[in-house]
Amino acid sequence: MNNKKNHAMKRSPFYLVPLAALLTAACMTPQYNKPVAPIPANFPIAQTDSGPAAVDIGWRAFFKNPELQEVIATALANNRDLKTITLQVEEARALYDIQSADRLPSVNATASESRSRALLTTSTPINRTVYQVGVSVTAFELDLFNRVKNLSAAALAQFMATEEARRSAQILLVGEVSKSWLTERTLYEQVQLAIRTLEGRQASFDLVKKRFDAGITNALELRQSDTLVQSARVSLLALKRQHALSVNALQVLVGTQIQSSASMQSLAKQETLATIGAGLPSELLTQRPDIRAAEQRLRAMQANIAAARAAFFPRIALTAGVGTASTDLSGLFNSGQNTWSFVPSVSLPIFDAGRNKANLKVAEVRSEIAVASYEKTIQVAFREVADALAARATLNDEADAQQAVQKSQSERLVLAQARYQNGIANYLEVLDAERELFTAEQQLLQTKLLNLTNAIDLYRALGGGIQEMSK
């Protein structure tokens, strides 16, 4: 008897169905292939610094100024853009939880009372009341082809991408706040410089006017001196306007009102951690959250391809229930009142006017877009680091050279004033020296700002700004 049964199973193909389903499901699970990073093995500018990696340096260690640290902390707590993306992370997590719930059956408790009236030809109508209680599982999909699993994987990847995007937004915010704060400090110092310059030129004008009134000098020198005064006044007004705009921009980033004060530390005393190890370009793939976010989005798109492929195969759903029923409420839980139901169903796509094919095509195209976006993100990151390294190679020397220019122009003005007072040179030489000194001092402040902001750009480009304290 058993031999006949075994022989029948060997001839029957139905016992192969579960095995075929498992093999097909394995094919439905995508094999993630990480694209090759389209960047060189090394940065164009050779680096000799052996400092710690930017990701290991907390922003409180990098930005040593206590006032700047307070501004950054306030921005992280109040910035509206960061709040928005933080809420988006919570939304993505909730969507992942919703999608993951589809992988488990939903069990519901039910209770009902139904009343009916039956019309009979042989007797009077009968009124009937039925009470039912029980638990049920409604349309639970047996995920034989990993459709639900891949949709859950896609939702998880989207959640991870959103979390990485939040980290990237924080890095960007820390960098932008610090640069905006330094810009405000620079403009404040330029305003103070313009005020001192205006006062000095006004004093020179008063002296020239006295000489003019005494008949020592001519009207041309008086007008030249007055022109220099008015030029300084125009520069002062323009710088005051720029400073006010910089304060407004900083307040938007910080999310609250801040005060610009003369007691704040001057730009010359600002310090950042200069010894940041650039490392290798390949390390950017793990250091930069925007690259990790792009990779997670790519994972999500590839999981969606597998889910779209699974739509071509049958969907098996189970609906089941167990409980008790009685026409008398008091007898609902008596022996012999048990009820149950078991309703499996299979849905196989036959004709859908090309909907499933179109969905698969959309998923494949979106995956290709995600690959291009991932590669572009890597290239942009490489360029940002390379640009910051190239600038760092010359900015320190440029700042030293500009400092020497400012010193020479200051000495030139002293000599020009002495020559004019001794009658050796005309006043035009003094005016030219004053203009050149003012320009040199403004450029010195700009060079210092550029040097500091470049250090911030390198710190951000290498993934620094997530940790508050150093590891």
Residue spans for each PLM region:
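Periplasmic alpha-helical coiled-coil/stalk elements that build and connect Gram-negative outer-membrane
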Residues: 3, 148, 157, 161-280, ...
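Small/polar-residue-enriched beta-strand and adjacent coil segments characteristic
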Residues: 31, 57-58, 66-67, 71-74, ...
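Terminal intrinsically disordered/low-complexity segments used for targeting and assembly
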Residues: 4-5, 10-77, 156, 240-286, ...
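Charged, alpha-helical scaffolding/interaction elements associated with membrane systems
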Residues: 78-79, 214, 422
